[in-house]
Design a protein with these regions (language model features):
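Hydrophobic alpha-helical membrane segments
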Residues: 1-278
């Protein structure tokens, strides 16, 4: 969680700048309605706010590059611990985390570095091709391709880190397998990604439709700091384990399948091991 604090800080700072701009516009609207300010001042304020938004978005995305890039090795460590929990296996939180970071830091850093530049590249390409569509509708094709590439990459991350800490793969094989599984299990993958965004959506609704934006942001930050990040990773790891059991483990000699799942035989074994008279 600590390694994600810079990212959270950048996002919160940008959200506060955007919110303060909305508050100023709302205040100016009330002044215009009461005759305390001219309508021309409100139009200028709206134009300034609209002109500020592209700069604010670009600045935020650029600042997020180093913040996200440093998270990869630590995310690999978390993925190893959470994967063991999802398998119902014991994990020494600190020592296993540290060992997983040491063993997977290169692939983890490369993965997070690519992830960090994705939003900037997507925003620039989407804006550029969006402007070019005024000249030719053919530019919709690369614009849609940008959306598809980013979505597939983000969905592939659900499988990338668990694979990284489970199998010995080069980075190309890691990315290829993740993309194949993300596309092959697209409905569930997208559904789980959207499910992880529900708290963010609820906070956004509270912020937009009530005067309690500060409390919504505080609750959102506390949720992700306390359980949100770990819970979403646990759910993702559980599903990734099931996908690996279907597509990867049957092709590996001696690989166990179904770890972490309930089996009726487990209850029978416990009854057999119980002392007589109990």
């Amino acid at each position: 969680v600590v390694v994600w604090l810079p990212t959270i800080f950048v996002l919160l700072n940008s959200a506060l700048v955007w919110y303060s701009g909305l508050v100023e516009l709302s205040t100016l609207e009330m002044q215009v309605a009461s005759g305390e300010a001219a309508a021309a001042a409100l139009e200028e304020a709206y134009a300034a706010f609209q002109g500020m938004m592209p700069t604010l978005i670009m600045q935020t995305l650029v600042l997020l590059i180093p913040c996200i890039a440093i998270t990869g090795p630590f995310t690999a460590g978390v993925a190893y611990v959470v994967r063991n929990w999802a398998r119902d296996e014991h994990a020494f939180i600190w020592s296993d985390f540290r060992d997983a970071v040491k063993q997977n830091w290169k692939q983890g850093l490369l993965t997070s570095a690519i992830t960090s530049v994705m939003p900037v590249v997507f925003y620039v390409c989407f804006q550029f091709y969006g402007q070019m569509t005024s000249q030719s509708m053919l530019y919709l094709v690369p614009q849609v391709l940008c959306v598809i590439v980013v979505c597939v990459w983000m969905c592939g991350l659900m499988y990338m880190y668990p694979q990284m800490v489970t199998y010995k793969l080069n980075f190309r094989g890691l990315v290829r397998n993740s993309f194949i599984m993300a596309v092959g299990r697209l409905p569930m993958t997208v559904g789980l990604k959207l499910l992880s965004l529900v708290p963010l959506l609820l906070a956004a609704l509270v912020a937009f439709f009530t005067p309690y934006m500060q409390y919504a942001m505080m609750a959102l930050v506390l949720y992700y700091l306390l359980i949100g990040l770990t819970l979403s990773r646990f759910i993702g790891a559980s599903y990734a384990n099931a996908v690996f059991d279907r597509y990867i483990n049957p092709n590996i000699e001696g690989a166990q399948i179904g770890r972490g799942l309930y089996h009726a035989e487990d209850d029978e074994d416990e009854e057999d091991d119980a002392p007589a008279g109990e």
